[in-house]
From Swiss-Prot:
It comes from Gallus gallus (Chicken). Keywords: Developmental protein, Differentiation, Disulfide bond, Secreted, Signal, Wnt signaling pathway. One of its GO terms (biological process) is non-canonical Wnt signaling pathway. This is Secreted frizzled-related protein 2. The FZ domain is involved in binding with Wnt ligands.
């Protein structure tokens, strides 16, 4: 365990007092949750191998059960794997699995500088995948470094992050297609849908996209029925290792095309639906007459 963190935890064990101002998402009732320390579960990959073994519940994000923490923490693993900052995991674990000391009522938050450093490096990565830096990670909530908090790692003990130009997902590359190109591409694929995104997840390095069921338009569909579409799932293969600037706003509709591969609908082309754009207007009109 790093010396600074050891000293921090030793100091924390001696600092009993009010929790006012230290729990930004609502002050917990420690009259009955005083010793609610739980072992960090083995399946919690986000915080596996962190410098401490016990976490406090409720955590800094308001999660009250281990199961809830496991479910929510999993969604942040891709950000850690992007290696946007050396302390990303430390910062996230200080929120999802804050260090717990039996004799301490105070919850130990990440320092303001830790949050700011991680945000500066990782917010652009999140934005590239269509996610803004969330309000729940607002750095102004966290204490200055001269208070009791989890600090940024010393620059003497970390290696600089290598920042390579991110690879663009093949399906998201700007090909400057006109309406004829789009129509030709449709004929090469098994499906073409206009969708709005309900949920994005990452599984085994691939991006799983779940569309809104009530906001999709079907232009082409081979091998699937309307019943199948009620639980439709689209896949962007290798999505964890590439960026897709086309999806930097998941609140807008998209035109997605792709092929059925091994029972999965794999996206080969993804474009933001530009309302009023000539190519998309012609596409909507021409699709009814199309004969591939």
């Amino acid at each position: 365990m790093p010396r600074r963190l050891c000293a921090l935890l030793l100091l924390a064990s001696q600092c009993l007092g009010s929790t006012a101002g230290l729990f930004p998402f609502g002050e917990p009732d420690f009259s009955y949750k005083r010793s609610n320390c739980k072992p960090i579960p083995a399946p919690m990959l986000l915080c596996r191998g962190i410098e401490y073994q016990s976490m406090r519940l409720p955590n800094l994000l308001g999660h009250e059960t281990v199961q809830e923490v496991l479910e929510q923490a999993t969604t942040w693993i891709p950000l850690v794997q992007k290696q946007c900052h050396p302390d990303t995991r430390k910062f996230l674990c200080s929120l999802f699995a804050p260090v717990c000391i039996d004799d301490l009522d105070e919850i130990i938050q990440p320092c303001h500088s830790l949050c700011e450093e991680v945000k500066e490096s990782c917010a652009p990565v999140m934005s590239a995948f269509g996610f803004p830096w969330p309000d729940m990670l607002d750095c102004s909530r966290f204490p200055k470094d001269n208070d009791l908090c989890i600090p940024l790692a010393s620059s003497d003990h970390i290696l600089p992050v290598t920042r390579e130009a991110p690879k663009v997902c093949d399906a998201c590359k700007n090909k400057n297609e006109d309406d004829n190109d789009i129509m030709e591409n449709l004929c090469k694929n098994d499906f073409a849908l206009k969708i709005k995104v309900k949920e994005i997840a990452y599984i085994n390095g691939d991006t799983k996209i779940t569309p809104e069921t009530k906001s999709k338009t079907i232009y082409k569909l081979n091998g699937l029925t309307e019943r199948d579409l009620r639980k439709i799932v689209l896949w962007l293969k290798g999505g964890l290792q590439c960026t897709c600037d086309e999806m930097n706003d998941i609140n807008v509709p998209y035109l997605v095309m792709g092929q059925k591969q091994a029972g999965e609908l794999v996206i080969t082309s993804l474009k933001r639906w530009q309302k009023g754009q000539r190519a998309f207007k012609r596409f909507s009109r021409s699709i009814r007459k199309l004969q591939c």
